[in-house]
Amino acid sequence: MRRTVSRKMGAGALVVGVAMGVYVGGTVGAIVGVLLAMIGFQALTRGVEGRPYIVTGLLTTAGLALIAWAHGLDAPEVGLGRSTWVHGIAIAVGIVVVVGVVIGIAGSIPRLQHLFADERITEVSGLETTRKALLDIPFGTVLIEEFAFRGVLLALGDVLWPLPWAVVWTSVLFGLWHISPALEMHDSHQATQGSSWTTVVGTVIFTGLSGVGFAILRLWTGSLFPPAALHWAANGTGVVVGWFVHRRLRRRTEYDPVGEREDPGHTD
């Protein structure tokens, strides 16, 4: 019942946010509309996976694009200018390869495997893991977050403040955006111990700093593709490697050669 109410409120916030962003004049009105739509998206998709999550992410991204269009932002200003597609995609591919190799190596080191011990993927099948890595994360998480924080909000912030302050501001928002996911991670990840608020504060700081890095990469390349690729590679590869780590650890636990041996001196 509570989750149903939360989703209804989220849907309302999403619709109102897009409408406000489109029809309310001024940059501040656009920013408030984007933030309200993002809050609505998070409330609407809490605990949701698969097609509903992806569709909601795509629709919300379309709503943010309407806000950007209504306030005169063009494709280059949000990191999607055609002139940047080729080199942006080339850099993105290189990032995916490098990050994938690094995370894969980290997952093979026993001392680092606890970093991938997420109970949310313990009982998940390989097919579900693949879907999450190739569909849910890129189209339901990365797309909307990068377009919102490194695309629309960064461009709108650049209108109000000097660019460095726009980077700081959007990165702080990106960190705060991860409060709810941090609480979920605390209950399911073996690498998080102690108070839940320790996890939240650590996550907000880490993702906020990551947001600065994503924004710098976006501005340096002029393209939204490289930060999106880095974001997806880190999350998607982490899920896949985590799944393999869980399988390996489970096999070690289930296989007990000592227990399987029979004592030759024992007779019934």
Give names to the regions the model predicted:
Residues 1-15:
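Short, Lys/Arg-rich, polar N-terminal cytosolic tail immediately upstream
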Residues 8, 22-76, 87, 91, ...:
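Alpha-helical transmembrane segments in multi-pass membrane proteins
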Residues 10-11, 27-34, 53-57, 87-92, ...:
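Residue-level signature of transmembrane alpha-helical entry/exit and packing/kink sites
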Residues 33, 37, 55, 59-63, ...:
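Lipid-exposed faces of alpha-helical membrane segments in multi-pass integral membrane proteins
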Residues 38-45, 63-72, 102-107, 178, ...:
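Structural signal for membrane-spanning alpha-helices in multi-pass inner-membrane proteins
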Residues 74-81, 111-121, 154, 190:
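Membrane-interface helix termini and inter-helical loops of multi-pass transporters
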Residues 80-82, 121-129, 159-161:
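Helix-boundary and loop/linker segments of multi-pass membrane transporters
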Residues 128-268:
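Transmembrane helix-loop-helix hairpins at the membrane interface
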